[in-house]
């Protein structure tokens, strides 16, 4: 068989009672239960670790469960965590609504303001958590510089690398300690399965693995198999996504109905040089403000015909969304304002369709303004 084997099993048979005891005690290698390990899932984990340059990777049921595992494994009641303001809405909810219940203190410095990160540190700061590029504004942080600050303060740096994937950025090589992925997005690449990944060094990963085996947000073997298929085309897909996204961003920047385009590949982007330095491509996500506020943004979205109105991204199909009322809709207006997410903002995750067809669909949106 040329493809990887798919092991759809919950448990494993042992040769003898002594064999079972030895495996459960960790005295001999081998699978004991698919909540712990599964051959298909293990293959996926090993390939992600190789791509990210990590000592170990562990797969989870979703990107959010990867963040849950990271924080619950490495932080305790009384610890302090710094999270960038520019993160996914559910990530903010997880920190604000749930982690704080366990006595974990959380503050939100601006992503790219290194001085603010250093000033926000406390003696009990345990973890820095960032998305770079961020969702949905494609804001960046100098990962190497932020890692130096975190380590000087005795903290770890975790980077959500979902938008770039290891095909375009490898945060561990820039000094980060842990990398997070929603494998649901570009690792899958076709909107088929849901999963997450935590990758890092041995001492941190031992704690994460222990939590996941106990708590059980386990990746299904079938989804791991889908992700293995996705990894085979990851680099070429990310190159194609990036090329089309840059061309679309440049085109949108010239349109009179657009106030501002957020895409680090643009020469006009204030962090363009940083993106060139720490990424090998600019990714697929292009966000922009239209003139006219929420009503205009909704008219633009509703006028499109080819793209899919959905908050998921990473698909071969282009998706379009209104962050203020969907992915970040649970945030307060004040929190959205601090994150730079206004009512006129539209996020487009550029797929692999013909670029001229995509521009024609965006032109329909512009005509509705």
What are these regions (language model features)?
Residues 258-346, 350:
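Conserved C-terminal alpha-helix-loop-beta "cap" of PLP-dependent enzymes
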Residues 2, 13, 39, 199, ...:
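Positively charged, small/polar-rich N-terminal and surface patches that mediate targeting and assembly
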Residues 216-217, 304-312, 365-369:
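A common structural junction motif
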Residues 51, 252-256, 304:
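Acidic-histidine catalytic/liganding microenvironments
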Residues 14-68, 90-97:
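Conserved N-terminal alpha-helix of the aminotransferase class I/II PLP-enzyme fold
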Residues 56-257, 262:
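Conserved PLP-enzyme active-site core in the AAT-like
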Residues 1-7:
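Short conserved active-site loop signatures built around small residues
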Residues 96-97, 105-106, 119, 237, ...:
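PLP-dependent enzyme catalytic core of the Aspartate aminotransferase-like
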């Amino acid at each position: 068989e040329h493809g990887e084997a798919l092991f759809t099993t919950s448990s494993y048979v042992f040769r003898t009672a002594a064999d079972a005891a030895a495996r459960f005690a960790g005295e001999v290698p081998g699978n004991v239960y698919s909540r712990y390990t599964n051959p298909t899932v293990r293959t996926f984990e090993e390939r992600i670790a190789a791509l990210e340059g990590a000592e170990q990777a562990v797969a989870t049921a979703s990107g959010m469960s990867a963040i849950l595992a990271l924080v619950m494994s490495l932080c305790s009641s009384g610890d302090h965590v710094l999270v960038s303001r520019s993160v996914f809405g559910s990530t903010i909810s997880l920190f604000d609504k749930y982690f704080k219940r366990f006595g974990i203190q959380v503050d939100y410095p601006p992503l790219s303001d290194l001085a603010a990160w250093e000033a926000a540190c406390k003696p009990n700061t345990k973890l820095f958590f960032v998305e770079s590029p961020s969702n949905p504004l494609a804001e960046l942080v100098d990962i190497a510089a932020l890692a130096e600050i975190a380590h000087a303060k005795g903290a770890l740096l975790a980077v959500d690398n979902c938008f770039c994937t290891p095909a375009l950025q490898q945060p561990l090589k820039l000094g980060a300690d842990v990398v997070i992925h929603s494998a649901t997005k570009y690792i899958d690449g076709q909107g088929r399965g849901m999963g997450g990944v935590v990758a890092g060094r041995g001492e941190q990963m031992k704690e994460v693995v222990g939590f996941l085996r106990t708590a059980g947000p386990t990746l299904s073997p079938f989804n791991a198999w889908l992700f293995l298929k996705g990894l085979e085309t990851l680099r070429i897909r990310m190159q194609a996504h990036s090329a089309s996204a840059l061309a679309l961003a440049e085109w949108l920047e010239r349109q009179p109905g657009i106030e501002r385009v957020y895409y680090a590949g643009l020469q006009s982007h204030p962090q363009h040089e940083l993106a060139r330095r720490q990424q090998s491509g600019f990714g697929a996500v292009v966000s922009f403000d239209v003139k006219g506020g929420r009503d205009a943004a909704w008219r633009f979205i509703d006028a499109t015909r080819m793209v899919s109105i959905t908050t998921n991204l990473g698909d071969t199909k282009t998706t379009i969304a209104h962050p203020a009322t969907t992915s970040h809709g649970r945030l307060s207006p004040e929190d959205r304002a601090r994150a730079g997410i206004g009512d006129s903002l539209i996020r487009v995750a550029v797929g692999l369709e013909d670029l001229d067809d995509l521009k024609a669909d965006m032109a329909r949106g512009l005509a509705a303004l």
